[in-house]
UniProtKB/Swiss-Prot annotation:
Keyword Zinc (UniProt): yes
Binding site for Zn(2+): H194, H196, E201, H243
The protein's annotated pathway: Glycan metabolism; pectin degradation; 2-dehydro-3-deoxy-D-gluconate from pectin: step 4/5
UniProt keyword annotation of NADP present: no
InterPro entries: KduI, KduI/IolB_isomerase, KduI_N, RmlC-like_jellyroll, RmlC_Cupin_sf
GO biological process per UniProt: D-galacturonate catabolic process; D-glucuronate catabolic process; pectin catabolic process
Record's function text: Catalyzes the isomerization of 5-dehydro-4-deoxy-D-glucuronate to 3-deoxy-D-glycero-2,5-hexodiulosonate.
Catalyses which reaction(s): 5-dehydro-4-deoxy-D-glucuronate = 3-deoxy-D-glycero-2,5-hexodiulosonate
Disulfide bond positions: none
Protein name (database record): 4-deoxy-L-threo-5-hexosulose-uronate ketol-isomerase
Cofactor: Zn(2+)
Organism (species): Shouchella clausii (strain KSM-K16) (Alkalihalobacillus clausii)
Length: 276
């Protein structure tokens, strides 16, 4: 398991591009036949990728968590961004197509990922946070998710937001997870920017062509930097940082939050004149 330690805003001001990438960019989540996990010390969030091929892949706690099994003290969100597959939780198996989301509650010992077709494998994106309460496992197919339209072509941010795990959707202990799809010829996300000092956030960018990139902006509003991101790479965003991006083409991203409070609207908007 890859470990990412916390960085404060004062130290961040001195970081080189390479130091920023080492601290905040997760480049290699998805590998056929493998499970990759990255542990952030910001709110103890774990993000990961599982790409089962001919054999199923079990969710393994490894040595880093010091628990008997992965979800002993954790909850989990699984979003499929690839071909059709299944997730088995205990004795129950859930079918998952692209963009479907599965919430798995604390205390489930056995979680296993499989693909229907090894030639078109499922690509499961995983997000896990610590949990002090158990909520039931629940599937949210993309067709049943409630879409919210925001932005406009004039602002280059015409997009659809799907909220999966939140106060008025699938209940969780502290995870909030959703997905944003940008329409063609629209490139901006989360601008005007905002902060939520009570929660960290992670972005996974995907549905991108090989030669396209997203320029992800981060840092305190008065001291911003950027990361250049490829398809299926993730960014860890500290609570003190903005998290916004612009692409060379449209894209999709999954956002996931953990920390204090459980209200989607708990955020502090940053005025344009504050950004530097």
């Amino acid at each position: 398991m890859d470990i990412r330690y916390e960085v404060g805003p004062k130290d961040f001001k001195t970081y080189t591009t390479e130091e920023m990438r080492e601290a905040f960019l997760v480049e290699s989540l998805f590998e056929e036949g493998a499970l990759h996990l990255s542990y952030s010390h910001y709110d103890r969030l774990i993000i990961g990728g599982a790409v089962p091929s001919h054999e199923a892949i079990a969710l393994d706690a490894g040595d880093a968590l010091k628990t008997d099994y992965f979800l002993e003290r954790r909850e989990l969100a699984v979003i499929n961004i690839g071909g059709k597959g299944t997730v088995t939780v205990g004795k129950d198996t859930y079918k998952m197509a692209k963009r479907d989301c599965l919430y798995v509650g604390r205390g489930n010992e056995h979680v296993e990922f499989a693909s229907n077709d090894p030639q078109q494998p499922a690509r499961f994106y995983l997000v896990s946070a610590t949990a002090h309460q158990t909520y039931p496992t629940k599937l949210a197919p993309i067709g049943e998710a409630q879409p919210t339209k925001l932005g406009s072509d004039a602002e280059s941010n015409n997009r659809t937001i799907y909220k999966y795990i939140h106060k008025d959707g699938i209940e969780s202990c502290q995870l909030m997870v959703g997905m944003t799809l940008l329409e063609p010829n629209n490139m901006w996300n989360t601008m005007p920017a905002h902060l939520h000092d009570r929660r960290m956030e992670a972005y996974l960018y995907f549905d991108m062509e090989e030669d396209t990139r997203v320029f992800h902006f981060m840092g305190q509003p008065q001291e911003t930097r950027h990361l250049v991101i490829k398809n299926e790479q993730a960014v860890i965003s500290p609570p003190w940082s903005i998290h916004s991006g612009v692409g060379t083409s449209n894209y999709t991203f999954i956002w996931a939050m953990a920390g204090e409070n459980y209200t989607f609207t708990d955020m502090d908007t940053v005025a344009m004149e504050e950004l530097k």
